[in-house]
A protein has these predicted regions:
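Mixed-charge (Asp/Glu-Lys/Arg
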Residues: 1-80, 85-203
Length: 203
């Protein structure tokens, strides 16, 4: 009889524990996604970000904190190129491609952000990277007036923002791109001459 009572008590305790666990699970809510505070983020934190999503979120929060109240993130895979869109101090819409890489950024970033300008009715485009750019990327950006913000620019923007010197941070962000004025015509002419020489030689 005593054994039966002990068994029943143990069974009740196990059942009660199971019910409590189930009810607790139902009442628990998923934790809210951590909101990035740009004032606390350093370049080292950015380097530790596992993918570009965190970097885009950081830049978005940074832009809002700098006073770009209309800044918004685009819709991932259906964004037609840019990660962010904002209006600068002159009232000009900018599209932004964010690249958090451990290696230099290539041509693709410039091609993507530049080709998205018409869709977003933007007059300016830029790429912001935690690294540097390849020479080919810099050349293409120069021909298309795409502003390339490298790691050093990003660090300056972060530092000025943390010091409360928002205007200086904005000056860097909104600075004009490096423009390549060399005409492509000369290169085309040279190429055509070479083709013509080969064609004449065959005759």
């Amino acid at each position: 009889m005593t054994k039966i009572i002990i068994f029943m008590v143990i069974l009740v305790i196990i059942t009660a524990a199971f019910v409590f666990k189930v009810l607790s699970r139902k009442k628990s809510y998923p934790p809210q996604s951590k909101v990035i505070d740009p004032i606390k983020i350093t370049i080292q934190d950015i380097d530790r970000m596992e993918d570009g999503t965190g970097f885009v979120e950081y830049l978005y929060r940074l832009f809002l904190a700098m006073g770009y109240s209309d800044a918004y993130k685009t819709r991932g895979g259906r964004d037609f190129g840019p990660d962010l869109v904002f209006t600068d101090g002159e009232g000009v819409r900018n599209v932004v491609q964010a690249k958090c890489y451990s290696y230099p950024v290539g041509l693709g970033a410039v091609q993507e952000v530049y080709s998205s300008m018409r869709y977003y009715r933007a007059k300016k485009s830029m790429v912001i990277s935690s690294n540097q750019y390849t020479s080919a990327c810099e050349e293409l950006a120069g021909y298309n007036a795409v502003r390339l913000h490298s790691r050093s620019d990003l660090i300056e923007i972060i530092n000025f923002f943390k010091l409360g010197q928002i205007d200086k941070a904005k000056d860097i962000l909104e600075s004009e791109p490096r423009i390549v004025l060399e005409s492509w015509d000369n290169k085309v002419i040279k190429k055509d001459f070479e083709v013509e020489k080969r064609w004449v030689a065959k005759k």
